[in-house]
């Protein structure tokens, strides 16, 4: 039922994460039902929606750089209690809250690596996971080295964009 809801979303906007990756985020996050998630970069709310369907309490950071999407994502997730924060994701690093799942789909390329490393060490709980969209845009080997080479999975969508999932073990 939830996978059908995800499939029925509008994926026509160019920068929207592909349906295969939104479903993957949902399926991987279900094991944390009742836990917490931090999303960095929401655009139309597809990732937020999948995390909510998985039963997580979601805090979403988005600076609304893509104007016109704030209302769309809030409408999509109106049946859930999402903590919407209109700020860049770096603001999440200002508190001591850790999350079961962190989904990062904000900005990309080499300059994102320090932010991802900070989220890994300071925001992902032990036994939690970091999910990153567009991992093909930066040096994966460098990122892996900096976070201690954890267990990970990478998948590619039909557009060639990659989703990386990194598992944090005690």
Q: Which residue ranges define each predicted feature?
A:
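Class I SAM-dependent transferase core
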Residues: 1-18
């Amino acid at each position: 039922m939830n996978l059908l809801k995800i499939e029925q979303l509008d994926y026509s906007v160019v920068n929207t994460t592909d349906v295969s990756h939104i479903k993957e985020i949902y399926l991987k996050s279900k094991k944390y039902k009742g836990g917490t998630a931090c999303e960095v970069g929401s655009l139309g709310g597809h990732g937020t929606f999948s995390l909510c369907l998985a039963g997580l309490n979601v805090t979403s950071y988005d600076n609304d750089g893509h104007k016109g999407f704030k209302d769309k994502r809030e409408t999509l997730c109106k049946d859930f209690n999402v903590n919407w924060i209109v700020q860049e994701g770096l603001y999440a690093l200002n508190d001591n809250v850790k999350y079961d799942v962190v989904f990062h789909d904000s900005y990309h390329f080499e300059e994102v690596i320090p932010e991802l490393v900070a989220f890994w060490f300071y925001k992902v709980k032990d036994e939690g996971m970091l999910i990153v969209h567009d991992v093909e845009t930066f040096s994966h080997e460098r990122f892996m080295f900096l976070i201690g080479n954890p267990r990970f999975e990478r998948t590619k969508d039909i557009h060639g964009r990659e989703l990386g999932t990194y598992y944090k073990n005690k």
